Structures are given as structure tokens and as C-alpha cells.
């Protein structure tokens, strides 16, 4: 009997060349599938994720699924996987899922967070986990800009020029930020996100905060559908795939 296993996985992306398997490079998928291969006596077991993350990008709530003939309980799976995975990957929870569940296609929404350290001095102990932006910021203007992103829009201006997906319409349900001393955290919940979309939004909103562009420039950028007009792509290290939402799960904090 084959079982479908769903895992919620956290990882520190610092020393990975991204999530997806790449020949000769250390990846999250490669490490995970290596452990599963050992557990299945040399048989290949493919995992499917809710989406890929780039080199340096972290995850607190990545979701993966795989099919297995092994008759282990969810708790046994969690213990076995965490005993063999490297220190920068942790399985947070395991459930046996219905055979129709799909980590990517069953997802209803995703939540990303982005951390920015705004102190005048660089913090060497945070350098892998937040972007450093030591400039005065107008938080009220940034909040106004974020509000204009909510709703259903074509986000062509806010995705990489390398994006091959033709349909770039997405719905942003929540776009907000919290300030805790010198730490600034952005939070985005949406139906889906294009390549580099969150990082380009953050780079653009930081320009609003510096007074380089007005908050309502967001509306003009959405209408223009031109990546060249938006701000820079914020660094990978500040980005976290925080949570993936499925049927029946609300988009609360």
C-alpha cells in the first residue's frame, strides 16, 4: 500500500544553492531525497514542494509531499527524517495526506515574510537572515504603498524579466509591515507569487520609504507592466517562505 506523506519543513537557505536539485550543488531537495533513498533501501523517492526557493532564501513553512510504501506513523517519520537530515533542515510536522493532496496544486495561498535590519551599524550575526538598510525610512509612506498592492493585479513590473509565465495576474490578500526597533518585517499573503516578486516589491517600497518615489507610484507601476520602472531586487537573505495555506486554513497571523 502506498501512502502520501505531507511534511512542513523549515530550512536555513544560507548554504544551499536553492531548493531544486542541481547537479553538483547542495540543495534542499537533494538532501531530503538523499535521506529518503537511504530509508527506502536505495530506491529513489521524489518529493514535490509547494514551490522553489532561490539560493540564500529561507523557509519556515515549506510544504512537501511524497509517496511511500513504508508503514511508519507520522511521528516515526518526523523522528527518522530529523535524525538524518543536516542541521540546516528540520521537519516541523508530518501528516498522512489523502492521495489527492498536492503540495503545490492544492495550495490556496502562500505567506512570505521579509526582514530588514535598519540600524546604522551592520550586525554580523544577522547578515544571513535579514537585509541591511541603514537609511532613515518614512514608515507611514511605506504602509500606504503596501496598501496599494492589495487586490488582484498584473504584477509584471514586480517580477524578474526572466519570468516565463505569461499570466502574471495575482491576488494579494495582505501586505503589511511591523516595526520592532531597528527590525522591519514585511508580511505578504497572496494567491501566488511570481519569480522575485516579493523581493522586488520590498526593494520598491524601501525606495518609497527613502523618499525616492511617492507611495502612489505603486499604482503607476502596476499599470505600466515594466520591470525596468520598479525598484531593485532586495537581497535573498531577508526572504522567508513562511506558510502555505490549504483548504480550511485562514490567513491570520
From Swiss-Prot:
Reaction equations catalysed: uridine(38/39/40) in tRNA = pseudouridine(38/39/40) in tRNA
The keyword tRNA processing is annotated on this UniProt entry: yes
Alphabetical keyword list: Isomerase, tRNA processing
Keyword Isomerase recorded: yes
Active-site residues from the entry: 54
Residues binding substrate: 112
GO function term, MF aspect, one: tRNA pseudouridine(38-40) synthase activity
Single biological process term from Gene Ontology: tRNA pseudouridine synthesis
Pfam hit, one: PseudoU_synth_1
Enzyme Commission designation: 5.4.99.12
Family designation: Belongs to the tRNA pseudouridine synthase TruA family.
Function: Formation of pseudouridine at positions 38, 39 and 40 in the anticodon stem and loop of transfer RNAs.
NCBIfam families named among the record's database cross-references: hisT_truA
Summary of subunit composition and partner proteins: Homodimer.
Name recorded for this polypeptide: tRNA pseudouridine synthase A
Protein source organism: Geobacillus thermodenitrificans (strain NG80-2)
Amino acid at each position: 500500500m502506498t501512502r502520501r506523506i505531507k511534511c512542513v519543513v523549515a530550512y536555513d537557505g544560507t548554504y544551499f544553492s536553492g531548493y531544486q536539485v542541481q547537479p553538483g550543488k547542495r540543495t534542499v531537495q537533494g538532501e531530503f531525497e538523499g535521506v529518503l533513498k537511504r530509508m527506502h533501501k536505495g530506491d529513489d523517492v521524489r518529493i514535490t514542494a509547494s514551490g522553489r526557493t532561490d539560493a540564500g532564501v529561507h523557509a519556515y513553512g515549506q510544504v512537501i509531499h511524497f509517496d511511500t510504501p513504508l508503514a511508519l506513523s507520522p511521528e516515526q517519520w518526523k523522528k527518522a527524517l530529523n535524525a538524518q537530515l543536516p542541521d540546516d533542515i528540520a521537519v516541523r510536522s508530518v501528516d498522512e495526506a489523502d492521495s489527492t493532496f498536492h503540495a503545490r496544486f492544492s495550495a490556496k495561498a502562500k505567506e512570505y515574510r521579509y526582514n530588514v535590519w535598519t540600524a546604522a551599524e551592520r550586525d554580523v550575526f544577522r547578515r544571513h537572515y535579514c537585509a541591511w538598510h541603514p537609511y532613515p525610512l518614512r514608515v507611514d509612506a511605506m504602509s500606504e504603498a503596501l496598501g496599494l498592492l492589495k487586490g488582484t493585479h498584473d504584477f509584471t513590473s514586480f517580477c524578474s524579466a526572466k519570468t516565463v509565465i505569461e499570466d502574471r495576474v495575482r491576488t494579494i490578500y495582505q501586505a503589511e509591515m511591523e516595526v520592532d526597533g531597528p527590525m522591519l518585517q514585511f508580511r505578504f499573503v497572496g494567491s501566488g507569487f511570481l519569480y522575485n516578486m516579493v523581493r522586488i516589491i520590498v526593494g520598491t517600497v524601501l525606495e518609497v520609504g527613502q523618499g525616492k518615489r511617492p507611495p502612489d507610484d505603486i499604482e503607476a507601476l502596476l499599470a505600466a507592466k515594466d520591470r525596468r520602472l520598479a525598484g531593485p531586487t532586495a537581497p535573498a537573505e531577508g526572504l522567508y517562505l513562511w506558510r502555505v495555506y490549504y483548504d480550511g486554513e485562514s490567513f491570520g497571523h
